[in-house]
Amino acid sequence: MTYWVWSLTASLSRDSVAPALSLQQQEKAVLAAPALPPSLQPVLAGVDPSEQLLKTLLEVPLDRLDDRQRLLLAALTRDQAERVAALALPLETQDLEPLQRALATAEPSTTLSDAHEQLLQNPALDPLLRQLSCEALGGSRDRCTNPEDADAAVGASQRLLLAQLFPIGALLIGVVLLLRDLWMRWRRALPAWPPLLGPLLSPVEITILVAGGFVLLGGVVLPVLVSPVIEVLFLGQPGGLGQAIGVLLSYITMAIPPLVILRSQLGALPDDNVPDGGWLQWRLQPWGRALLQGGRGWLMVMPPVVFTGWLMGRLVGDPGGSNPLLEMVLRSDNPLALVLLALTAVVLAPLFEEVVFRGVVLPVLARALGRGWGVFLSGLVFAVAHLSIGELPPLLVLGMGLALLRLSTGRLLPCVVMHACWNAATFLNLILLGS
């Protein structure tokens, strides 16, 4: 308990991914604007996406902006003091230093000099930075629009469109399904839930599983022993690959102790009491129905989770403490790194967490305290285990939704599918808006 309280408190000092995500979305909007139909531009990119990007950049402390973002700020702003401040910090990327000097010494002009035009051919400049810097150095909008960058604008418009329409569409479908389910439940038109079967463990045994295996051994002891080795072996890999390998190996290391303890606990139970489908009630067949149940559960849980996150933002703002993996995905441009991060988030995390929280914790607590308390407490433990106080309320709602799916289907596989769908949707959105 002390470890979780300390970790939750410490999560407040971690940066939130929200500002970085907002910046990426605004950058995509500026780049995509020329390729969007005029009727869609105000909806997808805003009336003045460049002004919105500048506003978003100014909301982030300069020391949290990377080299490229500070140059974007200097190129966009018309305030000399803001430009000087943005260009004052030294750059870590040497290839961008000529552009930094050009923006720092540029005088107000209506023409782009030949020297500046040559400077903008630097391959280190991406299409958006090249275009905005060109305009800041005196080039006209037409002259600064590079035909070779047209494909980048079209690609950005497609990613922006998908990143906005996909969650909105899923949210609307979820609202319809949720209202339909509530209506049918009120009319008593839904079938009764099956009996809740699970391991015949005691609350003390699941405390040993979670506190001893998950927290102490998996969260404290093994990371202290393994993390230095992982860091030495893989941290120097390019493009975030070392971080992705570290995340994957760290997650596997964290999962091993509780799974070993769980196997020992289940092995000690009498064989003649094992229910059909096993202690964890995987019930893999029919797998097609499990996919449908999991996908439907994901759509139905989205409205309450999104509403909870929105309400938290309105009441307390953004407290920070996002999962560091989110920003890794957002900034990574290494395909193999993204594959490893996806394997961790979309495959390993749903499998391990559903085994522990919906396969064991929920049935034991529901048998000891009743289904209502079992749903709430298993969801609370699930939320706290993510060690992010800012994301705790939405994760609590998500955990309760997963618990209700386990109760309504009597199977664990749909919960894994639902959890994987949630993580995959988040992952996809980050890739669409990321590097």
Regions found by a protein language model. Name each.
Residues G372-S435:
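Functionally important transmembrane alpha-helices
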Residues M1-D271, L430-S435:
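N-terminal, membrane-interfacial amphipathic/helix-forming hydrophobic leader that caps
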Residues V347-L348, V361-L369, V384-I389:
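Short, amphipathic, aromatic/basic-enriched membrane-interface segments that mark the entry/exit
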